[in-house]
Amino acid sequence: MTTLFDVLSNGYKDKKKKSKQLGDYVLDESLSNHNHQTYYNPKDKKLLFNVTGTHNSHDWLTNIKLGLGIGYKESDRYKQSHKALRDAKQKYGINNATLTAHSQGGLTANYISSKGDNVVTLDKATTIGGKSRENSKDYRTNGDIVSLLASTRHNTINLSNPNKQTGNIIYDTLQAHDIKNIKNEKLFV
């Protein structure tokens, strides 16, 4: 089985360091880039689609749009991930996929998923009045500010923060948002 940590951390690696296989899932490089990764399990005929969180300067501009509630679905980031997921479903003849994501990628995964898809996120970016799909499971690290607005939603699972609080608010907040917080958790996708 593949863990959520393995999928998310592989998404942040640069192309040369990305694992080509996670458990029985094989990376489809033709439908992957630095913003999203497509994995197919030929044995079980399952599709896994990961949307990476903020990792470059363009993403920070997208974060501003997200925060203001304008133009997010018009962003290249959103459009590319949406198209890649649809193309992957068509290529593999799959209607229902599992989508994983972290931070900004979590909001994207929520938006691009279909009714039958399962969405599993960590510290998903959330907007005021934003909704989560019924088919999503949103893990949130206590102390994470990006996902704070989702902390009381029915599909949010609040995880304890494994980091020692230093009293430095900026440092502690960044630590709470790190995917390494779930490295030892048994969260399978």
Language model regions located:
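A conserved cap/lid and substrate-binding interface adjacent to the catalytic center
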Residues: S9-T98, N118-V120, A125, G130-E134, ...
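Generic recognition of flexible, low-complexity loop/linker segments
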Residues: H36, A109-N110
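Serine hydrolase/lipase
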Residues: K43-K46, I94, S113-V189
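Gly/Ala-rich beta-loop-alpha elbow adjacent to hydrolase catalytic centers
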Residues: T100-G105, A109
